[in-house]
């Protein structure tokens, strides 16, 4: 994107016909366009279908643009997404989705047009209001340049993810256990053999909200063990207000954090977040100006909010 002028025009629309809902949005910029359309159909109570089509030209650009897609920005992507949700029995819910996408232009780690698929299945069991258990499986296939070929050889990579989570929230106390497993397989250039890398993690989090004092405390601990960066794992944590924090880890080590929030009254809020990552497979962390001598990395975040109300 270059020049001394810029514009971006957009329009959104919605149409409802019985149990069918059509929602869409279109935008055009100085050089490209972006289209997103969604069809949602409610078959019966507890049963629904969702179809999403997206078409983002490779030369479309917008300020702070965010939309549905495989990439992080509405740019250089076409795709169809189909999802279905069903609740055939009491306390049970099933969800399945399939995303077929393509990139008409080159992008990070791929020097030509490419395509891929992303499928997911999740089964959720909730026998009572404060207890939930779910099992999630996800499969993704993409294409990537083979290292050392200068972008002349492109082969597929396969990513399998499995997650099991148990959540118990009896009143002011909540407890959540999560186990993740990753398997990354890449086809090598010689003989088309597969190279497999694995990773797993176990995360335990607990939270408590005091009834007689405006204080909420949560702690979380994670152990991770992965073969390399491709088999890295993600562990979401509570962060500051209006922010999301989902760090990634690879190698072997522990991650623990504490989150304390105090709402003094309707006007003042004070929040402290402390976290530390301790690696067991290295003596230094990072490189260059971010190099840390040692195997531990500590982060501290403090937020103070003042709300003005009439």
Which stretches of residues belong to each language-model region?
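Exposed, low-structure sequence patches enriched in small/polar residues
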Residues: 2-310
